A protein has these predicted regions:
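Phosphate- and other anionic-substrate recognition elements at nucleic-acid/protein interfaces
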Residues: 2-9, 15-137
Length: 137
């Protein structure tokens, strides 16, 4: 693990909303930050300026069999746009079941969460998945 790699910002891309989380390589944990409207590049820039990440992680929506689905190419394009616009290395991470896991966490907390809160929780789970396994990257 590179010594200077400390902050990671993760995204759960959707056609209407993008969940955002921040993670740290030291703890290998991530925290939900917010949910942004899709294509809100100004807000994304503000978040990246604030957190100064060394890596961006984008959830890759695949079918349960691991094949591309309708949103897969859109998420890949979003990842390429992030890297191109901001010059920060961007990786795609399999996001299968993260939304379901986020709903289960919300149920365990016995508190109803909005769709936007679920999206940012999903972004945290995607980010943590990369943090737990990034040595293989």
């Amino acid at each position: 693990m590179p010594e200077n790699l400390t902050t990671v910002v993760g995204f759960d891309f959707g056609s209407h909303w993008i969940g955002v989380a921040v993670g740290q390589t030291l703890t290998r944990q991530a925290t939900p930050l917010t949910t942004l409207k899709a294509n809100d590049w100004n807000s994304i820039k503000r978040l990246l300026d604030e957190w100064q990440p060394q890596k961006l992680v984008v959830g890759l929506p695949l079918s349960m069999t691991g094949e591309d689905q309708e949103m897969t190419e859109s998420a890949k394009r979003f990842g390429r746009q992030l890297e191109g616009r901001f010059g920060i290395s961007t990786v795609m991470v399999d996001e299968r079941l993260t939304t379901r896991e986020a709903y289960q966490i919300a149920m365990a907390q016995q508190r109803k969460k909005s769709k936007q809160e679920i999206d940012s929780m999903s972004a945290a789970l995607i980010t943590e998945a990369w943090l737990q396994n990034h040595d293989a990257d």
